A protein has these predicted regions:
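Short, Lys/Arg-enriched N-terminal segments with co-localized hydrophobic residues
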Residues: 1-8
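Short catalytic-loop micro-motif centered on adjacent basic/acidic residues
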Residues: 53-55, 76-79, 103-104
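Active-site-lining helix/loop region of Rossmann-like oxidoreductase modules
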Residues: 9-26, 30, 48, 123-169
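Rossmann-fold NAD(P)-binding glycine/threonine-rich loop
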Residues: 67, 80-102, 109-123
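Beta-loop-alpha module in the N-terminal Rossmann-like domain of NAD(P)-dependent dehydrogenases
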Residues: 48-71, 82-87
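Short acidic low-complexity segments
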Residues: 36-50
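A short helix->loop->beta-strand "cap" motif at the edges of active sites that frequently abuts
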Residues: 72-75, 97-99
Length: 169
């Protein structure tokens, strides 16, 4: 599917690791234009012609990247994990500025179905004799964040659904 010229977007990519490179390939195949690629320090003036920023950088950089984009009036889709404690502040700034900000720890349809199933099962199993939820995460050796954002989300959803679980470790 290739968008018509009126649907094509001018994109900025912040973070050009494996995921950023995949996003770039897909965006170009779909007819979008990459206006900026940043893999470190960047200037908000480079967002002048950008409709949307896609951010897959590092946890220590994500908050600054997202807030710079929002202050520049550019919508942000962020998939960087590991900065959960600062996401509420980014959401607050977004609301104050009337901006657009979407965060997800995982964009896979299958994993998002897993999130829903995890919550649904935990709610129904809570209180059942012998129900003792346990998570174990296994990744390839090049995985940068551990635990992953996906594992954290699964654990947080279990904590919300199961009364006797107060925290994860």
């Amino acid at each position: 599917i290739v968008p018509s010229n009126e649907l094509a977007m001018n994109l900025a990519l912040i973070g050009h690791g494996k995921m950023g490179q995949q996003v770039e390939r897909c965006a170009l195949e779909l007819g979008h234009s990459i206006q900026m690629i940043a893999n470190g320090q960047w200037d908000s003036a480079s967002l002048k012609r950008v409709d949307l920023t896609i951010e897959f950088s590092r946890p220590e950089a994500a908050f600054e990247n997202v807030t710079k984009c929002l202050r520049a009036g550019v919508a942000v889709v962020c998939g960087t994990t590991g900065w959960n404690d600062k996401i509420p502040a980014a959401e607050k700034l977004c609301k104050e500025l009337g901006g657009s900000f979407l965060f997800a720890s995982n964009f896979s349809i299958g994993v998002n179905l897993l999130f829903a199933l995890n919550k649904w099962l935990a709610e129904r199993m809570d209180g059942q004799a012998g129900f003792a939820p346990e998570l174990e995460e296994i990744h390839h050796e090049h995985k940068l964040d551990a635990p992953s954002g996906t594992a954290i989300r699964l654990a947080e959803d279990l904590i919300q659904a199961v009364d006797r679980i107060g925290q994860w470790k």
